[in-house]
């Protein structure tokens, strides 16, 4: 995927130049090959606390710079204090940039990305239990390959317009449940939703991970509110929950969507604008660590959290076992914060104004727990 938006990028570089200290351009040598990358360091990072790391992988023929601004996670990194790295792939025999995600011989990109994690951790304070991978197209393929081959290091993955090659699917050997999110358009002509030569259909990919993670076989689903009626597409959100170690599988099906990143400011085809893919991917990632949900998504037992009634046509009551101060955040299906407040009692009521799927997150110290609620 080549993104033709150099004029747009020039303006972004001019703005980013005011804060040049936040983007580091560096490289490592792996297997005798010079491999470079861009690292975005949020202003909140001070090195005193270990922070998550997100790998953001470009598509075929694209590069780290284009991916930084097209699949833009910088607002999420700023708001949530995580490191964001955009590495470059190598060049294939057509002299195009790519990730070796298709099972053939060539550069050891799994080894490179593992070495990159180590290199970054040597310089920065990385929480190695919270390393995630996402990517566009070929970068999505590569994220799936990491889920298969580097599941001991990658806590969760998300693919936008990617899939798994049939070779990789048949040889996938993850050593633990891996939370997976796929965002894909039904009108994607580059990586067809229903598969093609060597490309696994998206429903089959979802089934593989639902089975591997031992999730509930039937998904909860909800239409994403069609807030932008001129973008030429709509979206539906599927969640397979109940997996081992708290794992889930999520899928955003973009009905009529093309080979594009939802919410992107750069239009390279039919792009869904009803939700922000980057915000949703971070919402998904933030629930998980290598140990499952324990490190980032589970309150201590003395602070149990329940929601009732659920589903509800009106209000939801949140109940806690103690009165420790907690931050309550209500997030809608498109990743927007609807409510956020602090509570010190053992009960509080939340009242979403519109029907739909929401996520309630409770933050207590370093712990974050999320539950899904549905307003009828």
Where are the language model's segments positioned?
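C-terminal tail/sorting-segment detector
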Residues: 355-376
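Short beta-strand/loop motif that positions the catalytic acidic residue
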Residues: 182-184, 188
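A glycine-anchored, Pro-Gly-centered beta-turn/N-cap motif
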Residues: 24, 314, 354-357
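A domain-start/cap signature at the N-terminus of enzymes
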Residues: 18-53, 134-158, 164, 204, ...
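Bacterial Sec-dependent N-terminal signal peptides
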Residues: 1-23, 293-296, 310, 319, ...
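Serine-hydrolase catalytic machinery in alpha/beta-hydrolase-like enzymes
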Residues: 24-132, 145, 149, 171, ...
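Short, glycine-anchored, charge-dense loop/turn motifs used at functional sites
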Residues: 330-338, 358
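Residue-level detector of functionally pivotal "anchor" positions at catalytic/ligand-binding pockets or at interdomain
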Residues: 218, 289-308, 314, 321-323, ...
């Amino acid at each position: 995927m080549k993104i033709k938006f150099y004029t747009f990028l020039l303006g972004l570089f001019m703005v980013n130049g005011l804060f040049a200290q936040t983007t580091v351009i560096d490289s490592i040598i792996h297997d005798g090959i010079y491999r470079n990358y861009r690292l975005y360091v949020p202003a909140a990072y001070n090195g005193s606390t270990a922070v998550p790391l997100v790998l953001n992988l470009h598509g075929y023929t694209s590069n780290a710079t284009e991916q930084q601004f097209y699949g833009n996670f910088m607002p999420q990194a700023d708001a949530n204090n995580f490191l964001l790295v955009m590495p470059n792939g190598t060049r294939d025999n057509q002299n195009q940039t790519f990730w070796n995600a298709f099972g053939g011989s060539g550069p050891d990109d799994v080894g490179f990305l593992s070495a990159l994690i180590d290199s970054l951790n040597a310089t920065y304070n990385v929480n190695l239990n919270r390393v995630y991978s996402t990517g566009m197209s070929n970068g999505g393929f590569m994220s799936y390959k990491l889920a298969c081959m580097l599941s001991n290091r990658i806590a969760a993955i998300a693919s936008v317009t990617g899939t798994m090659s049939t070779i990789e699917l048949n040889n996938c050997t993850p050593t633990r449940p891996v939370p997976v999110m796929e965002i894909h358009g039904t009108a994607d002509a580059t990586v067809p939703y229903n598969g093609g030569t060597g490309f696994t259909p998206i429903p089959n990919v979802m089934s593989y991970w639902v089975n591997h993670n031992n999730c509930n076989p039937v998904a909860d689903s909800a239409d994403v509110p069609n807030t932008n009626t001129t973008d030429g597409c709509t979206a539906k959100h599927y969640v397979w929950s109940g997996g081992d170690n708290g794992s889930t599988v999520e899928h955003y099906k973009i009905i009529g969507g093309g080979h594009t990143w939802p919410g992107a400011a750069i239009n390279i085809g039919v792009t869904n604008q009803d939700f922000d893919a980057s915000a949703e991917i971070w919402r998904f990632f933030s629930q998980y660590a290598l140990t499952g949900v324990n490190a980032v998504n589970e309150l201590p037992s003395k602070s149990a959290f329940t929601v009732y009634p659920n589903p509800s046509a009106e209000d939801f009551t949140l109940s806690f076992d103690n009165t420790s101060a907690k931050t309550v955040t209500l997030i809608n299906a498109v990743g927007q914060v609807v409510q956020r407040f602090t509570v010190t009692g053992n009960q509080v009521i939340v009242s979403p104004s519109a029907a739909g799927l929401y996520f309630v997150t409770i933050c207590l110290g370093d712990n974050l727990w999320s539950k899904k609620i549905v307003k009828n």
